[in-house]
Curated annotation (Swiss-Prot):
It comes from Rhizobium leguminosarum bv. trifolii (strain WSM2304). This is Proline--tRNA ligase. One of its GO terms (molecular function) is ATP binding. Keywords: Aminoacyl-tRNA synthetase, ATP-binding, Cytoplasm, Ligase, Nucleotide-binding, Protein biosynthesis. Belongs to the class-II aminoacyl-tRNA synthetase family. ProS type 2 subfamily. Catalyzes the attachment of proline to tRNA(Pro) in a two-step reaction: proline is first activated by ATP to form Pro-AMP and then transferred to the acceptor end of tRNA(Pro). The gene is proS. Homodimer.
Amino acid sequence: MRLSRYFMPILKENPKEAEIVSHRLMLRAGMIRQQSQGIYSWLPLGKRVLDKVNAIIRDEQNRAGAIELSMPTLQSAELWQESGRYDAYGKEMLRIKDRQDRPMLYGPTNEEMVTDIFRSSVKSYKDLPLNLYHIQLKFRDEIRPRFGTMRSREFMMKDAYSFDLTREGAEHSYNKMFAAYLRTFDRLGLRAIPMRADTGPIGGNLSHEFIILADTGESEVFCHKDFVGFDIPDDRTDFDSVDGLKAIFDKWTSLYAATSEMHDEAAFNAVPEGDRLSARGIEVGHIFYFGTKYSEAMGAKVQGPDGKEHFVHMGSYGIGPTRLVPAIIEASHDDNGIIWPASVAPFDIVVINMKAGDQACDDTCELIYAALTKAGKDVLYDDTDDRAGTKFATADLIGVPFQIIAGPRAVANGEVEVKDRKTGARETMTIEAAINRFVA
């Protein structure tokens, strides 16, 4: 992508309305634009990051055996009245009527709709277990939206829903998502700590929030510091192994970890003083097991091996991609801008032409740009005629992991400079070596 032809509206000044680092940097880098209170457009640079976040989420959901579908954002109020939750959500739920005066709502979540899909199609235990998920925009009329897309009214959510014949089967499905979430956050460059949580209006009796530590977090968290060093389930993880996944769950829930809502001061004080960690954190995922709450209310049942009908046991599992993007920035930035983990960076490399219009610089940059693009790399080529300082500031601000810098003096010697955005390390090398570094 040539920067001269790209839409990336950079802001030179810090926006006054931005309270936290991620909101400020997302606005300055031209990733998002506020349309109204708590509602944002995702501009091209931001959407590239969001798409890569979603790709990782989708990959790990599929690995864990979940199946993707797509449900509508507008839902019938009748389903929510049937489950008994229509009034529980209060003013957070946006309620409307269609031209036939039928009550509708803009879905804040999808337990009712997916249960309706299940009950109309699945009749036998032989079709279980089943886990359905989708990635969709949702709306909750937050009383105080703030922090950009960290806490917005319209947001994107990956929500998955599991169906099992028994509680034991449902716990295995829960453990699958538990392990999948640990892997997902790790691939996004985050260390997430699972903490027992309140089930809230979703309901049920088992729930975990996944929290990343950040000074700007809304939650106060208390946990054992060993969580920071725990190994993440690797690619060899067998998602069909009941014992293997139970061992992962037991390990990650064996030590004390809780947000302020579930905090037990006496239990925390039982942790050796040197092992206690008190901090602030950001919720990046939430999983629930709620048994037969919805299946009983909505008649979702299957015929069991005994020939009798059984209400299915359900769980739901949410990750907010539009919340994850600012969370990653909160965890990875410096005074100059964003430092993206390679897995979600909008571009892999930015090629900086220090003197656009100089034939040697132009030819060198075109050569590098073509070679890296052909090798399948996402490359941003800064071919603008901006000053060198502006080019460097832009590259640092948007956080692309590597910069290849081509100036007249270096190019005359057949060389370019490669900068690592994370470490700041710079290395001069031949043009061929620079290309081979990223395509070998």
